[in-house]
Amino acid sequence: MITTFDKIVNDLAQLDFFSGYKFRKRDYSLFFKTESGKQFIELDHWRDRDTTSSLVIYPIYGVRFDVLHKWFEKFSVKTLQDQRDRASISFSGSMLGLQDELNFDTNGDGYSKEFENFQIILKCAEYVFSEYSSLDKLYNKTILPVLDGETGLPDVGVDWIFIDMALCKLVAPANFDKLKQIILSHVEKMYAHQEPNILDYYD
């Protein structure tokens, strides 16, 4: 039997873990709506250039809290759909110390074993969806280390700035001014290095 991306998605949907999930074709994601937003696995995929019979799937695991994105919507240069498709935080497999890409033989050879191996995505998803299941957990893992000087800030992108500030304002408003100063100082450095995304918001 020929292995296709649609077959893999259909088989995933039969697993108990994905009960209640829906598949959205425009970004190839399995997502579950929560009270505060959504949890999702985006399944980027392509044919291997060197081995045309190999289908490569690259999962991204994300959690979104709508409240962290709402205020910035009217200022963003991105389309509303693009903004609302985005996660508040996301990970690849390697960021979790696990496998990034998973391969399937499109001829169907060894499909059962490959699909069993593919279920490593459940381990990744369970971790992300549990460890980042609330604003408090997200704050403790992403904002506190910045405030304590244990980790730095991203050198690219813009969305994270407003997500982090909104998160701090909601969870720990007493720390908002401190975080704001850290972020503003970092943004000035990004601007000095002509980071393209930052330039979109400077006159």
What are these regions (language model features)?
Residues 2-24:
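Amphipathic alpha-helical segments
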Residues 20-37:
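A short acidic/basic microdomain associated with nuclease active sites
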Residues 2-5, 32-203:
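Intrinsically disordered, low-complexity regulatory regions enriched in serine/threonine/proline
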